[in-house]
Regions:
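Short loop/edge segments at beta-strand edges and connector loops
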Residues: 13, 101-102, 150-152, 169, ...
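Active-site substrate-recognition segment that forms the wall
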Residues: 1, 29, 33, 62-65, ...
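Hydrophobic anchor at the start of a short beta-strand
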Residues: 7-9, 97, 179
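C-terminal lid/capping helical subdomain adjacent to the catalytic/cofactor pocket in oxidative enzymes
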Residues: 4-7, 99, 146, 161, ...
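Helical element adjacent to the flavin cofactor pocket in flavoenzyme catalytic cores
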Residues: 120-178
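Glycine-rich FAD pyrophosphate-binding loop
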Residues: 3-25
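Short beta-strand to alpha-helix junction loop
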Residues: 43-46, 72-82, 121-140, 149, ...
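Dinucleotide-binding Rossmann-like beta1-alpha1 core, especially the glycine-rich loop
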Residues: 27-108, 255-256
Length: 338
């Protein structure tokens, strides 16, 4: 966007484009539409869907984007009553969401578990391949004039007395007038280079995949187990972000998201655990997640897992995005947080 507005942009990437969280996630998009009074979340979710439409439909990038909609499983009567009220409230505020019976859900997702009390359906949610999408954004930026430098691990950032910054990597030095920190889970160490404390914690997410299969799952899939638990206690404190699946090493809830990729792989994940910069997968957690997924899509219980992986997500301590100007530094901006 900056390059399209004729700004001179240099992007420094520690590894390769899409090599970490931007390329390791499930690839789910969007919320429940714009609503009657769009807020920041609306722009970040529904706005993202519009950007993907533009990139794929208008600009011709193959991002495997489609507006598939999301089905979120409701597992018991207490959850059903809670989300029945929630759906009414959201619809009154102009959001696109429906409460479906299991029979209605199976009419649009035949493999869904027909024994559950119901499902929430959000037609304005979509999906895309995260690696293809991130690389497409990088290519579009270069076509608009941005310069992308990969394998540039930043080791220091120095404010200049005349304004601007010097950024030192392991191999090069760069200077700029304005600096944007879009460093995800690495906000803490990068912030320390500038003498500022950024309240973002690395949270490990992990996923698993089956072999490629003919099309069996049409929507992105979720579950209300976690959101219902977080509605009662989000688990946050002064050092712990809200809405995690573990606290102090113990599981507090189960979280779920997944879809079937264009290549036929079925991928699911959900765990959110504060473990520092730990990329190792936990086989026990993977199995808990697979069992959770099979409660929603039963045939998954019969499929072997062929690969697993993990990535780090940037969770802010208050659960809100951190976007905008950093007030204690001139010409310093940040885009981070979940």
């Amino acid at each position: 966007h900056l390059a399209e507005k004729n700004q001179d942009v240099i992007l420094l990437e520690r590894g390769e484009i899409a090599s970490e969280a931007s390329g390791q996630n499930m690839g789910g998009l969007g919320g429940s539409g714009w609503g009657n009074n769009p807020d920041l979340l609306s722009y970040l979710t529904a706005g993202s869907v519009e950007i993907f439409k533009r990139m794929q439909i208008d600009m011709g990038y193959d991002m495997e984007f489609r507006l598939s909609g999301t089905l979120t499983a409701i597992h018991n009567e207490a959850q059903y009553e809670y989300y029945q009220d929630d759906v009414v409230s959201q619809r009154n505020n102009g959001y696109e969401i429906e409460l479906l019976s299991a029979r209605e859900a199976r009419a649009i997702e035949p493999e869904a578990n027909g024994k559950l009390p119901g499902y929430m359906y959000r037609p304005q949610r979509g999906q895309a391949d995260p690696v293809k999408s991130t690389r497409s954004f990088a290519h579009a930026a270069e076509m608009a004039g941005a310069i992308i430098n990969t394998r540039q691990n930043v080791v220091s950032i120095t404010p200049l007395s005349a304004g601007g910054y010097t950024i030192q990597t392991e191999s090069s030095e760069f200077r700029c007038q304005k600096l944007v920190l879009a460093v995800g889970a690495w906000c803490k160490p990068v912030g320390e280079m500038l003498g500022i404390k950024i309240p973002v914690i690395p949270i490990r997410g992990q996923m698993w995949a089956t072999e490629s299969l003919p099309v069996r799952i049409l929507h992105t899939i979720g579950s209300t187990i976690s959101s219902y638990a977080w509605s009662e206690d989000d688990g946050s404190d002064n050092i712990t972000p809200p809405n995690l699946t573990h606290k102090n090493g113990s599981r507090t809830t189960r979280h779920l998201y997944g879809r079937q990729r264009k290549n036929g792989e079925i991928i699911f994940g959900g765990d959110r655990e504060s473990l520092g910069y730990n990329f190792k997968t936990d086989p026990a957690g993977i199995e808990v997640n697979r069992e959770h997924a099979a409660e929603v899509i039963p045939f998954l219980a019969r499929l072997p897992i062929i690969r697993t992986w993990a990535g780090l997500m940037p969770f802010s301590l208050d659960g809100s995005p951190i976007i905008g100007k950093v007030p204690i530094r001139e010409n310093l901006f940040i885009v981070s947080g979940l």
